[in-house]
Amino acid sequence: MEKAENEKKPSAVSDVGAWAMNVTSSVGIIMANKQLMSSSGFGFSFATTLTGFHFALTALVGMVSNATGLSASKHVPLWELLWFSLVANISIAAMNFSLMLNSVGFYQISKLSMIPVVCVMEWVLHSKHYSREVKASVMVVVVGVGICTVTDVKVNAKGFICACTAVFSTSLQQISIGSLQKKYSIGSFELLSKTAPIQAISLLIFGPFVDYFLSGRFISTYKMTYSAMLCILLSCALAVFCNISQYLCIGRFSATSFQVLGHMKTVCVLTLGWLIFDSEMTFKNIAGMVLAVVGMVIYSWAVELEKQRKSKVIPHGKHSMTEDEIKLLKEGIEHMDLKDMELGNNKA
């Protein structure tokens, strides 16, 4: 009994570590990118090319990791990697278009809508069902973050199409990460190492043209300064941790859990934006933050309640012992797969 509890503690600690890394790096990169791309900052308005830089550094880290033996390379069909990279790149480009063509309020609403979209996709693709408590907690989080972020909503046809494309492709991308990991028994960082070079090459080739369409300027016309270069390097470093932690989180948790818990980052961004960039903070923002946090607490309780209900279901009949043995065998295999996915345990 004590041995089982001791085995759960490292897993719980690594789960918290992966989530903390994701929140810190995700919030940090938003702050760095805002300073880098805003007109009051360095005016580097080439978001798609910048994302190419991010994946180029991530690919380099993956190559070094494979060369030094920190991670093993497993085979994944090239067509699956190309398909996933295409979906991921469409997601990034559509998000940039959505942010450009829509108000910040509508852009945030489109991000919130990924939660129900992921739920529907997991229901359709994986026949996954959710309890009433989980559904209610998702609604509380959506309402809370919606109140917190939405100020004005100005919808136009092009922006709406881009937002819908971004929501669908990003939701599909997040579900695909978990599916590929399970299908090929591949670790999160190993999968990232395989897709990052493809995404880097494609974004660096087509990114400048996308950015020209968005801003009317080519990156070659930008006057680079030492401070701007340092900010770009900081952004790239944070992107590496953000990408790694995103794969770790989705590998450990379901895509829906990642989406719901991910809106904690929105609250952090709004708070830091208010403190650092003097963004407006109204009573509605504060009330939304509180409601979102309450929703996340309810969500945690609902998930634990659902686990307890499933654990109390004891199979009856003459084949019950065989089913128990199969269940234990499956849990052992899944436990081994999880250890393989834990990047921190590779060379700890």
From Swiss-Prot:
Q: Name one GO molecular function term.
A: antiporter activity
Q: What is its main location?
A: Golgi
The answer to keyword RNA-binding applying to this record is: no
Spell out where the chain crosses the membrane: 12-32, 44-64, 81-101, 104-124, 133-153, 160-180, 196-216, 230-250, 257-277, 286-306
Gene Ontology, cellular component aspect: Golgi apparatus; Golgi membrane
Query: Briefly, what is this protein's role?
Result: Nucleotide-sugar transporter that transports UDP-rhamnose or UDP-galactose and UMP in a strict counter-exchange mode.
Task: Please identify the protein, giving its name as recorded.
Answer: UDP-rhamnose/UDP-galactose transporter 2
Q: What is the lineage of its organism?
A: Eukaryota, Viridiplantae, Streptophyta, Embryophyta, Tracheophyta
